[in-house]
Amino acid sequence: MQLQFRSWMLAALTLLVVFLIFADISEIEEEIGNSGGRGTIRSAVNSLHSKSNRAEVVINGSSPPAVADRSNESLKHNIQPASSKWRHNQTLSLRIRKQILKFLDAEKDISVLKGTLKPGDIIHYIFDRDSTMNVSQNLYELLPRTSPLKNKHFQTCAIVGNSGVLLNSGCGQEIDTHSFVIRCNLAPVQEYARDVGLKTDLVTMNPSVIQRAFEDLVNATWREKLLQRLHGLNGSILWIPAFMARGGKERVEWVNALILKHHVNVRTAYPSLRLLHAVRGYWLTNKVHIKRPTTGLLMYTLATRFCNQIYLYGFWPFPLDQNQNPVKYHYYDSLKYGYTSQASPHTMPLEFKALKSLHEQGALKLTVGQCDGAT
């Protein structure tokens, strides 16, 4: 009997170890309700690992030497100028779209809809599962009745990241020519129009932006600055991740109240509760072992649903540019960031490597230098 008990204990411990190893992916699969995902999804980026040691890639820009991320010497990128050699791979783009649709549907997951919630409903935060929030009247009023991207389709889309690599790029005019332009975290555009453009069709706003860029609206001056930025959106989609973490609740409510009080002309959207885990599940299944997807990667994943061709600007998670010059983390402020810090919730260099590989294969175009025709 004692031997049998020990055998059962050993079996239980073995199962526990296996569970801990695969808990992350198992949790994702459970939450997105895709029990067959791991076995049935074929990787759209199945060459990522086979190419992980390649140093050369064709990206639009000037002829540079190898770029080394000094914070992590194992990540090196030789970037050659040959924008004319890039060709869109429509077959691959369609394959990626089809595979992502097995995890999420951007048309539906881009926002919770008014018919699915009512004031007072309890929601568990995505990152603070033991914490809850009640759907406020203001939030309910701003929920869209239908998806802001329902039946939408665009020939070309630009996703504009916020890296300082955009400075002096002269990409503004090119960015504005795209059918649909996505920007991140209410980044300012007026003062940087030559490099980042002005057109905005969708802009994200993490709640932390209110603290970092608008001093938590401590007085009328900062509230007016935020209002000016919101009014400048002029009918664009304002995408607010309201259900991520408890710490953002008050900031989301402040913004909602301002929008309603001042009748700001924006179309608010609040991503579905399953979106982040579904996006992460897709990339993990394709062996891109991210922690938490950045806003830029989220936007790319969503854009595959409604964009024929996707162009990325301002994606550069390294402290030096192609010519070994310092690059600001954001083009518009002096914030510092540890790209390879273990404490970071993101794995930006790894994401960049994946996007770079997709650029090589023609699934997207990644611009990290000056745009064609820039002076």
UniProtKB/Swiss-Prot annotation:
Disulfide bonds join C157-C307, C171-C371. CMP-N-acetyl-beta-neuraminate binds at N162, N185, T294, T295, G296, W316, Y329, H330. Pathway: Protein modification; protein glycosylation. This is Alpha-2,8-sialyltransferase 8B. It is found in: Golgi apparatus membrane; Secreted; Cell membrane. It is a single-pass type II membrane protein. GO terms for biological process: ganglioside biosynthetic process; N-glycan processing; neuron projection extension; oligosaccharide metabolic process; positive regulation of neuron apoptotic process; positive regulation of synapse assembly; protein glycosylation; response to cocaine. Residues 24-375 are lumenal. CDD domains: GT29_ST8SIA2. It catalyses: [N-acetyl-alpha-D-neuraminosyl-(2->8)](n) + CMP-N-acetyl-beta-neuraminate = [N-acetyl-alpha-D-neuraminosyl-(2->8)](n+1) + CMP + H(+). Gene3D superfamilies: Glycosyl transferase family 29. The chain crosses the membrane at residues 7-23. Belongs to the glycosyltransferase 29 family. Its EC number is 2.4.3.-. Keywords: Cell membrane, Disulfide bond, Glycoprotein, Glycosyltransferase, Golgi apparatus, Membrane, Nucleotide-binding, Secreted, Signal-anchor, Transferase, Transmembrane, Transmembrane helix. Catalyzes the transfer of a sialic acid from a CMP-linked sialic acid donor onto a terminal alpha-2,3-, alpha-2,6-, or alpha-2,8-linked sialic acid of an N-linked glycan acceptor through alpha-2,8-linkages. Therefore, participates in polysialic acid synthesis on various sialylated N-acetyllactosaminyl oligosaccharides (alpha-2,3-, alpha-2,6-, or alpha-2,8-linked sialic acid), including NCAM1, NCAM1 N-glycans, FETUB N-glycans, and to a lesser extent sialylparagloboside (SPG) and AHSG, which does not require the initial addition of an alpha 2,8-sialic acid. Glycans are attached at N60, N72, N89, N134, N219, N234. InterPro entries: Glyco_trans_29, Glycosyltr_29_Sialyltrsf, GT29-like_sf, Sialyl_trans. Pfam families: Glyco_transf_29. One of its GO terms (cellular component) is Golgi membrane. Autopolysialylated. Autopolysialylation is not a prerequisite for the polysialylation acitity, but enhances the polysialylation acitity. The keyword DNA-binding does not apply. One of its GO terms (molecular function) is alpha-N-acetylneuraminate alpha-2,8-sialyltransferase activity. The keyword Signal does not apply.
